Amino acid sequence: LGLDKSMISLGSCTMKLNSVSSLTPCSWPEVTSMHPFAPESQTAGYRELLESLERYLVSCTGFDACSLQPTSGAAGEYAGLLVIRKYFERIGQADRNICIIPRSAHGTNPASAAMCDMEIKWIDDSRGMDVEEFRALCEAHKDRLAALMVTY
């Protein structure tokens, strides 16, 4: 089983969006073999790489800061939804807690939303995402809408 040989199923959205060639550096020992307790004097290159990525992401998004962990999967969903919840709390709109999720979403989507105290509103996507139904759902909850989670 491999990304370049067969379909990767549930829980691998991030992997599906990256070509195999872009993942090659992830197999290089120079990238993957740093020991977690390596002395600071031996990790300057890693720190420079990660800190410049953080600065780049902050400049692109307009956020005050960013986190490179967690990177994907249910932990990434949860982290993203926590950011959304905290944002609305910070601007005095803590009542914005509705998350629209397609019925076909994998179970981590509603689980992550529920763990963030979000109220889930389902959208039927058995015929694909109906734009008019989506607009109507957004309009019906416009004062409390916080997020939309769409996976494939």
Task: Describe the residue ranges of each PLM region.
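Flexible inter-domain linker/hinge segments
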Residues: 1-9, 14-21, 26-32
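Conserved N-terminal alpha-helix of the aminotransferase class I/II PLP-enzyme fold
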Residues: 31-71, 76
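Short beta->alpha connector loops at strand-helix junctions that form conserved
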Residues: 103, 122-126
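Conserved PLP-anchoring active-site segment centered on the Schiff-base-forming lysine
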Residues: 87-107
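Active-site nucleophile and cofactor-binding loops and adjacent substrate-binding regions
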Residues: 10, 67-75, 101-105
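Active-site phosphate-binding strand-loop segment of PLP-dependent enzymes
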Residues: 129-152
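Gly-rich Lys/Arg/Thr-decorated short loops/hinges at beta-loop-alpha junctions or inter-strand turns
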Residues: 27-41, 58-59, 114-122, 142-150
